């Protein structure tokens, strides 16, 4: 048995194929999906989706938040943005992660606008997801 996984962003279909297993970064923690999983809808956090293909290899997709629906061995993930781990340049992702971390540290040392700090934390989370997806 297998699952049909679709990862859709507003501007493109990121992934559409059959897989053996999916691990989703839900807002309440990692969520493993295998064939026969109960139907559900869950919120997706910024993080890394892991999928095991029929050949047993694991691949990663960086997700930038959204929702996932599981129904009858179909997993549909609707996200704000997504990127296949194998298409991310490792050096660029690591550089962006370090820059985001430095920007957040600079803001946390200052008293001031919490909206800027929230944006910096979100940027750090996105950069971390991209960096982790490429390293998987």
Swiss-Prot record:
Residues 112-136 are annotated as: Disordered. The keyword Transport applies. Residues 116-125 have a biased composition (Basic and acidic residues). It holds the Pfam family ATP-synt_DE. GO terms for cellular component: plasma membrane-derived thylakoid membrane; proton-transporting ATP synthase complex. Disulfide bonds: none annotated. One of its GO terms (molecular function) is proton-transporting ATP synthase activity, rotational mechanism. It comes from the Bacteria. The keyword Membrane applies. InterPro entries: ATP_synth_F1_dsu/esu, ATP_synth_F1_dsu/esu_N, ATP_synth_F1_esu_C, ATPsynth_dsu/esu_N. It is found in: Cellular thylakoid membrane. Keywords: ATP synthesis, CF(1), Hydrogen ion transport, Ion transport, Membrane, Thylakoid, Transport. It is a peripheral membrane protein. Gene3D superfamilies: F0F1 ATP synthase delta/epsilon subunit, N-terminal (2.60.15.10), Helix hairpin bin (1.10.287.540). CDD domains: F1-ATPase_delta (cd12152). F-type ATPases have 2 components, CF(1) - the catalytic core - and CF(0) - the membrane proton channel. CF(1) has five subunits: alpha(3), beta(3), gamma(1), delta(1), epsilon(1). CF(0) has three main subunits: a, b and c. Produces ATP from ADP in the presence of a proton gradient across the membrane. HAMAP family: ATP_synth_epsil_bac. Belongs to the ATPase epsilon chain family. This is ATP synthase epsilon chain. The gene is atpC.
């Amino acid at each position: 048995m297998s699952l049909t996984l679709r990862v859709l962003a507003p501007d493109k279909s990121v992934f559409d194929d059959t897989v053996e297993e999916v691990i989703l970064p839900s807002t309440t923690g990692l969520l493993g999906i295998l064939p026969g999983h109960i139907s559900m809808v869950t919120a997706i956090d910024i993080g890394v989706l892991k999928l095991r293909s029929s050949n047993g290899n694991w691949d990663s997709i960086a997700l930038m938040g959204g929702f996932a629906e599981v129904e009858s061995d179909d997993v549909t993930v609707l996200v704000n943005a997504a990127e296949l781990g194998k298409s991310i340049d490792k050096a660029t992702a690591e550089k962006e992660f370090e820059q985001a971390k430095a920007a957040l540290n600079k803001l946390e040392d200052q008293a001031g606008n919490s909206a800027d700090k929230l944006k910096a934390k979100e940027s750090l989370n996105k950069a971390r997801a991209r960096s982790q997806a490429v390293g998987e």
